């Protein structure tokens, strides 16, 4: 049997992860077993266990693979381009990267992954993904302010995700329109989301203090 492929490659999810999402699209995710995934991927259970000891580990690997594809396509931030436009490009790279597995993603979301624990783990993974997205466009995701920006971007992403799941256009034009609208709204009402890294600047020079006139 084929050996399990390495995880987290920038060129996309490995065959085991792809097999899991293909099964999710055909069956209910909660009904897909690890044995089913091994059979679909043409690997032994031992090889599957070595690569991914649980279905949640497969979902985590998928998120990481998508993150790597998004970051691999990132370019150094252009100061002439607005943060809104940079975020638009980064999130559209994410939707483009996920398109081959869209049916599987929809099925997994309908089933709520494997219950509350998996859903909470998924939320943590998405927050990490959004933090990396912010960093890739030149916006710091560190500290309390970074946490607010990360959660704000996650809200934009999840709102657009609902449109993307139903978008049957070849160029994802509905998704692009929805994303642009949500980012524009965020830009209008939550300027902290679009606050990039500020260059360190010296404090303004103080005017010289004139000696007080004699009394």
What label would you give each PLM region?
Residues 2, 135, 166-215:
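C-terminal peripheral helix-coil segments that are non-catalytic and often amphipathic
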Residues 3-16:
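Short, Lys/Arg-enriched anionic-surface-contact patches
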Residues 15, 36, 86-89, 93, ...:
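Amphipathic alpha-helical interaction segments
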Residues 15, 23-61:
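Helix-turn-helix
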Residues 19-23, 97:
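Short amphipathic alpha-helical elements of helix-turn-helix/winged-helix folds
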Residues 61, 75-107, 114, 124-125:
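Hydrophobic alpha-helical connector segments
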Residues 64-70:
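Short, basic, alpha-helical segments at the C-terminal edge of helix-turn-helix-like DNA-binding modules
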Residues 116-139, 147-159, 177:
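Amphipathic alpha-helical packing segments from all-alpha helical-bundle domains
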